[in-house]
Amino acid sequence: MLFIILFTSFIGSVRAQSGSDSLVMSYMQEMGIPLTYNNKIELLMTGREKFINLFEAIRHARHHIHLEYFNFRNDSIANTLFDLLAEKAKEGVEVRAMFDAFGNWSNNQPLKKRHLQAIKERGIEIVKFDPFTFPYINHAMHRDHRKIVVIDGKTGYTGGMNIADYYINGLPKIGKWHDIHMRIEGDAVRYLQGIFLTMWNRETGQHIGGPAYFPKLPQYPDSVSEEIAIVDRTPKETPRSISHAYAASIEAAQKNIQIVNPYFVPTKSIRKAIKKALKKGTKVEIMIPEVSDIPFTPEASFHIVHKLMKRGAKIYLFKGGFHHSKVMMVDSTFCTVGTANLNSRSLRYDYETNAFIFDPSTTNQLNGMFERDKQNSTLLTPEIWKQRSGWKKFVGWVGNLLTPFL
């Protein structure tokens, strides 16, 4: 509540800057979130695009490769990745990989002790973040949900995809998997590197750092350079950073907002910002998947989007598989791509990273994806809502009460 009051006051004081992108950039500077101006971005719109691009970048690594993922699924994609990493380690490239213990445990094809030992024997440093020890409840929250790769301190990746072949092949129960990842070259990579090294050094007790990990970077011409803010969520240090950045962006919107998120059970501050945007006439479109890989959450999501539909939001139920993308586009001028779901788990508990990109061209690419995916979606209407069973509506109502824990 205090954030909304402060941000509303802030918006009023800088409204003369006009554009929503300018408002949010000013907000981020006020909050101490660094803006970087010398960047090149490539959106990777499918799993195949991501892994082809990532593997090629790994082949060209010369000094170090850093990977931080929620999980590495023990399948053909992970095997190809670790083969590549082993080759680079043999060449003398430093290779460090980190994955979340819960993310691995919840994976139906986890990396087991024998797999980790084999990986280490090939010259790859691999670490499990926050292993489960007694009392286990102490480890239930604050999981590392980030997906970060940094190569030679010059090239970075982040977005919604872990390491698994279902990003290419899909899954039997939910069909084709849709997701968004991105490649960054330029100054924003320094912040991805800093996030990784902070976590790595904390978990291992090592002291990796120095100029070799933060090399001098080329300057890109203004015609291609893009402005990026890396917004990182660390539970104790920056617990509300991504939630506030989302709410600020929604609050600043002047024309339209498009959101795609797989587990749409947002915090009260984000819901309040959306309602306020609708009240002032901003067009709000939200896309959620019709099917999900997680039980219970979809019913809570349906309950929430139905409430927003009644206030004027357009809700699209994607039926072409599972849309796992975590993106938002505002006024066709700026967007965010990252790891954070719009649920309490991501916004209140886990380690997450989102890139806020102030560039119309990149934003328009995502707008185009949204418009294409509308063709494979059902618009939620009062009639469709009435067709839902009473049981599903009840489960959604209960889920809405439990959103602080989802």
Task: Specify the residue positions occupied by each region the protein language model found.
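Bacterial N-terminal signal peptides
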Residues: 1-9
